[in-house]
Regions:
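Short active-site neighborhood of thiol/selenol oxidoreductases, capturing the structured segment around
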Residues: 71-99
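Thiol-/selenol-based redox modules, centered on thioredoxin-like
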Residues: 167-210
Length: 210
């Protein structure tokens, strides 16, 4: 299942924008499709889907610690899904710290949330670079950093509208954060930079409505 065309186009455009030093947030649309149900929940995010309307594209990948993660089998947690480079020096560390802020906001809420990262740098990620990234981002949520061969990852990047390009000394890629509910359905997509407080608020709303 492919991402909405407008989101894919924005993600690819943002991929180019990052190479030029332009934040993805500058490419945000003035309005995005929102379901009546999500309006009632007062959710944020540039793309929103009604409950049960769009299954998140399925994938199964191994984590940095070696265990296999299947998105389709994950029903215990609301999943925050994003795509990062552990050696990135620009947008990724910023998003990492924002995700840390989301986790701290949710710490006392009791909401079952898991952070799932799919790498955009299968050529350079190491366990050491992943641990360093996680430590500097100060994550307190349960998290998984998933990888695989470029051939295995490309269909997943494509399904979620993530543009990835190798350039000398860097990986240029788009930055999108998805929320997948406990039924395995897409609910919200945020373009970078998002507001951590709004993401945490949306997750609380979804947890109460599920």
């Amino acid at each position: 299942m492919l991402a909405p065309r407008w989101l894919t186009a924005l993600a690819v455009a943002a991929c180019v924008g990052i190479a030029l030093g332009v934040g993805l947030g500058l490419a945000r649309p003035r309005s995005a499709p929102r379901s009546d149900q999500n309006r009632e929940l007062a959710l944020h995010g540039q793309a929103q889907w009604a409950a049960g309307s769009r299954l998140a594209p399925a994938f199964a990948l191994r984590g940095a610690a070696g265990g296999l993660f299947s998105l389709r089998s994950e029903r215990r947690h609301i999943v925050l899904l994003t795509f990062l480079d552990s050696r990135c020096k620009r947008a990724c560390p910023l998003e990492g710290r924002m995700l840390g802020d989301v986790g701290r906001d949710l710490k006392s809420s009791g909401v079952p949330v898991e952070l799932v990262v799919v790498t955009v740098d299968p050529w350079g990620d190491t366990r050491g670079s992943i641990r360093k990234f996680m430590r500097e981002s100060r994550w307190n949520l349960p998290w998984r950093w998933l990888g695989g061969s470029p051939g295995r990852l490309r269909p997943i990047w494509h399904a979620y509208g993530i543009g990835v390009k190798q350039v000398p000394g860097d990986i240029v890629h788009s930055v999108v954060l998805y929320v997948v509910d406990r039924g395995g359905y897409l609910r919200i997509a945020y373009l970078f930079p998002f507001v951590p407080r709004e993401v945490a608020l949306d997750i609380r709303h979804l947890a109460r409505s599920y």
